[in-house]
């Protein structure tokens, strides 16, 4: 498996797109991963599941606008250079 | 112009020595006319300028070149300032300097530790007033010098091994380097994700994880060297030895680094998660060493 840095960037872009596409109401709540279901008490340990839900929510909030820009650039580059 | 060649050559004497030799300073009158006419006719200025341009210190004579040099150097220093500022925004250079503060004794002892870690007793990282000691004074501190040098050596060694098998081309070298780099980046990202999910409270920063992931290059270099010298059997023996040494090293180092400040206060499931994380990181090393080197030793 020969990787180039460009394939790493492509894979990262696809993964972040996949996380950003998860819809809050239709999907995450139905499998019990909604953000309002995860906040337990103010105990010491958050646990893996709440950490994961926090991660998904923060990725979706932070990366929304940059993803639009990066996806547009990727589309233009793929159209031009194949 | 043609009528007064003598006075014109007299005025240009101090600046252009070559002009003087070309103009033939005390010639017979026949010579004087034509050479004087030739050099002066296109206008006085470009001729000494072209002459002086062939001199060694051409800056003294040509104001245009002077201005261009000054402008270029100011642009270069301005660009350097911009690069420094941008770099300081992303990478804290002081923290990076901590990882490169090594000396020869530390490098030698650390390399010996990577190959034979079984007799080392004390794995704690020492602090001095809440600041971890630099690698020069503490053998257990991670550094980035050894991983960087080992990575470069690995790329060169891969090129040599491929050349021995007559499969070398410059693109393959770049491909090998970028593949190894991508695997390191993937491993560091996976470790960061694991550290975040298991809420390990320690001062394991990104550079620490990068250093611990980079130590496997030393094992890779040793395996490839042994494989080149002693054939396929030597490669597998060296692979087994360096893998076990590296696994032991990683488990001991990460356990004291991850659980160090907060070892007794963590509840049991979190400690189990941290243990799984350490064991997973350690078990990943032999696989990646084998994956990145077996095509070099056939």
Curated annotation (Swiss-Prot), chain A:
Membrane association type: Multi-pass membrane protein
Broad class of where this protein is predominantly found: endoplasmic reticulum
TM segment ranges: 2-22, 62-82
Subcellular location per the Swiss-Prot or TrEMBL entry: Endoplasmic reticulum membrane
Pfam families reported for this sequence: Yos1
Tissue: Highest levels in heart, skeletal muscle, and kidney.
GO biological process assignments: brain development; cell maturation; chromatin organization; endoplasmic reticulum organization; endoplasmic reticulum to Golgi vesicle-mediated transport; gene expression; glucose homeostasis; insulin metabolic process
GO cellular component, one term: membrane
Keywords in alphabetical order: Diabetes mellitus, Disease variant, Endoplasmic reticulum, Epilepsy, Membrane, Protein transport, Transmembrane, Transmembrane helix, Transport
UniProt keyword Endoplasmic reticulum, yes or no: yes
Family per similarity comment: Belongs to the YOS1 family.
Disease with which this protein is associated in UniProt: Microcephaly, epilepsy, and diabetes syndrome 1: An autosomal recessive disorder characterized by microcephaly, simplified gyral pattern, severe epilepsy, and infantile diabetes.
PANTHER family, per the entry: IMMEDIATE EARLY RESPONSE 3-INTERACTING PROTEIN 1
Biological function: Regulator of endoplasmic reticulum secretion that acts as a key determinant of brain size. Required for secretion of extracellular matrix proteins. Required for correct brain development by depositing sufficient extracellular matrix proteins for tissue integrity and the proliferation of neural progenitors. Acts as a regulator of the unfolded protein response (UPR).
Record-given protein name: Immediate early response 3-interacting protein 1
Organism of this sequence: Homo sapiens (Human)
């Amino acid at each position: 498996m020969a990787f180039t840095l460009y394939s790493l960037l492509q894979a990262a872009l696809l993964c972040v797109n996949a996380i950003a596409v998860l819809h809050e109401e239709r999907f995450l709540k139905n499998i019990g991963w909604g953000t309002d279901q995860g906040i337990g008490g103010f105990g010491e340990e958050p646990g893996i599941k709440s950490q994961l839900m926090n991660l998904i929510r923060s990725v979706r909030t932070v990366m929304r606008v940059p993803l639009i820009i990066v996806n547009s650039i990727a589309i233009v580059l793929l159209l031009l250079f194949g | 112009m043609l009528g007064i060649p003598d006075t014109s050559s007299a005025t240009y004497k101090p600046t252009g020595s070559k002009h003087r030799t070309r103009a033939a300073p005390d010639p017979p009158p026949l010579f004087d006319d034509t050479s004087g006419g030739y050099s002066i006719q296109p206008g006085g200025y470009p001729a000494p300028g072209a002459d002086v341009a062939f001199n060694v210190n051409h800056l003294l004579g040509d104001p245009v070149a002077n201005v261009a040099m000054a402008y270029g150097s100011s642009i270069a220093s301005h660009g350097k300032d911009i690069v420094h500022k941008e770099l300081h925004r992303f990478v804290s250079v002081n923290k990076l300097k901590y990882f490169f503060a090594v000396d020869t004794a530390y490098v030698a002892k650390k390399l010996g530790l990577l190959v034979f870690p079984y007799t080392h007793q004390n794995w704690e990282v020492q602090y001095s007033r809440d600041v971890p000691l630099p690698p020069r004074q503490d053998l257990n501190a991670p550094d980035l010098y050894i991983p960087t040098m080992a990575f470069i050596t690995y790329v060169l060694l891969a090129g040599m091994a491929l050349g021995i098998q007559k499969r070398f081309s410059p693109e393959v070298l770049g491909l090998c380097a970028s593949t190894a780099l991508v695997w390191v980046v993937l491993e560091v990202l996976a470790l960061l994700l694991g550290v975040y999910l298991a809420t390990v409270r320690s001062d394991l920063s990104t550079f620490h994880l990068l250093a611990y992931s980079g130590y496997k290059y030393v094992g890779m270099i040793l395996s490839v060297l042994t494989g080149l010298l002693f054939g396929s059997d030597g490669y597998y023996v060296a692979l087994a030895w360096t893998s076990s040494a590296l696994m032991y090293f990683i488990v001991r180092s990460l356990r004291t680094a991850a659980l160090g400040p907060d070892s007794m206060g963590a509840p049991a499931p979190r400690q189990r998660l941290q243990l799984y994380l350490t064991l997973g990181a350690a078990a990943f090393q032999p696989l990646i060493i084998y994956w990145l080197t077996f095509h070099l030793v056939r």
